[in-house]
Regions:
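Nucleotide phosphate-binding/pyrophosphate-handling subdomain across enzymes
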Residues: 141-245
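Short internal beta-strands
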Residues: 87-91, 223-224, 243-252
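Walker A (P-loop) phosphate-binding motif
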Residues: 1-12
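Short, structured coil segments at secondary-structure junctions
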Residues: 47, 102-104, 216, 243, ...
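C-terminal helical cap/extension that packs against the catalytic core
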Residues: 234-282
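Residue-level signal for inorganic ion chemistry
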Residues: 13, 34, 54, 70, ...
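Beta-strand->loop->alpha-helix junctions that form or flank phosphate-binding loops
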Residues: 11, 104-122, 173-177, 187, ...
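Flexible active-site lid/hinge loop adjacent to a nucleotide/diphosphate
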Residues: 24-116, 121-123, 128, 135, ...
Length: 282
C-alpha cells in the first residue's frame, strides 16, 4: 500500500497505537490496521473498506473462555461494513467459509489448496486473482522471499486486500516480491557451524507455531514455551512428525508442554529457566 499511496499509516496491534497517528492523518490517508479480538470487543463505528480474517484457531481462551465467544468477537470486524465494502476470508477455514455465506460485504476467498471460481488462489507455483471478469497473475511463489505455505496465504490475502483497495497489480507484484519476513515471524537470524537460527517468537499460539515448524526444511531444535493461554498443545506436538529432534522448554508453560509431549511419545526434552540458557543448550 505504501508503494502506491502517498499517505499510509500502519497501526494497531502491531505496536503502533491507532490514536498516536490520528492527528497526522489527512482526508486522503489510508490506514492499514491490525485489530485484535480485544479491540473488536468494543467497536461502535469502526468500518473498514476492506477487512480480512486469515484463520480462526484456538487463542486467548484465558480471556474469551470459549471458542464460540472468540469466533463471535473476531467476526465483529464486518459489523459495520456495507455491500460496497470487501471482506477477505480463508476458504480452507470451515468457520470462515460458512461465515462468508451470510455477511453484508462482498466476500473474496483465498486458498492455497484449490482453484476458486472467484477469489485468489495458488495454481501450481502461480498466485492467481480471479475476478468476475478476468484471471490476473499476481506472482510466482519462487519470486517470494518468505518461507512456507502459510506465507503464500498471507501474500494472497494481502494482494486481494490491496487490489480491492485500488492498488495496481504492478505495485502489488513489486511489493510482495520485495517483502521480507517481519521481525519475530520465522525471521532468519544467522547461520553458525552449519546451524541456521530463526526467530519465530511471534508464534504465540499452537497454530502459528505449527506454521513455523512446517516452514523448516531441515532437522530442527525447537525452543518453546511462554505465557499460558489455556490452549491444547497436542496438535502442535503431533506436527513435529520426525522433524523436531529436541524440544527446549522455557516459561510458564514448560511443565504443561512437557507432560503433553511425553503423553504423545516425544521425550527428547530439555527444561531451561530462560531463553539465554535455552540457546546455550542448543
Amino acid at each position: 500500500m505504501g508503494d502506491a499511496r502517498e499517505s499510509v499509516f500502519v497501526v494497531g496491534n502491531i505496536g503502533t497505537a491507532y490514536t498516536s497517528k490520528s492527528l497526522e492523518m489527512r482526508e486522503d490517508s489510508v490506514t492499514v490496521a491490525e485489530i485484535s479480538s480485544f479491540q473488536l470487543e468494543t467497536i461502535e463505528q469502526f468500518r473498514p473498506k476492506v477487512s480480512a480474517i486469515l484463520n480462526i484457531t484456538e487463542d486467548h481462551l484465558n480471556r474469551h473462555h470459549t471458542m464460540e465467544e472468540y469466533i463471535r468477537v473476531k467476526e465483529l470486524i464486518t459489523k459495520n461494513q456495507g455491500p460496497e465494502d470487501v471482506c477477505v476470508l480463508n476458504y480452507e477455514d470451515e468457520v470462515l467459509r460458512k461465515f462468508g455465506e451470510n455477511i453484508v460485504p462482498k466476500v473474496v476467498y483465498f486458498s492455497s489448496l484449490r482453484k476458486l471460481d472467484q477469489g485468489i488462489y495458488l495454481d501450481g507455483d502461480q498466485i492467481i486473482l480471479k475476478t468476475e471478469k478476468e484471471e490476473i497473475p499476481i506472482v510466482k511463489t519462487g519470486e517470494l522471499k518468505i518461507l512456507g505455505r502459510h506465507n503464500h496465504e498471507n501474500v494472497m490475502a494481502a494482494a486481494a486486500m490491496a487490489y480491492y483497495a485500488g492498488v495496481s497489480v504492478e505495485s502489488i507484484h513489486k511489493s510482495v516480491c520485495e517483502f521480507v519476513a517481519v521481525p519475530h515471524r520465522i525471521e532468519y537470524v544467522t547461520e553458525k557451524n552449519g546451524v541456521a537460527y530463526y526467530n519465530d517468537s511471534k508464534g504465540t499460539n499452537p497454530d502459528a507455531a505449527i506454521k513455523g515448524i512446517q516452514a523448516m526444511n531441515r532437522p530442527t531444535l525447537l525452543i518453546g514455551g511462554g505465557y499460558d493461554k489455556e490452549s491444547s498443545y497436542d496438535e502442535w506436538i503431533e506436527s513435529f512428525d520426525g522433524k523436531v529432534r529436541y524440544l527446549v522448554l522455557i516459561g510458564q508453560t514448560k511443565e504443561k508442554i512437557k507432560a503433553a509431549a511425553e503423553r504423545l511419545g516425544f521425550t527428547d526434552i530439555i527444561l531451561c529457566e530462560d531463553l539465554k540458557e535455552a540457546v546455550q543448550n542448543l
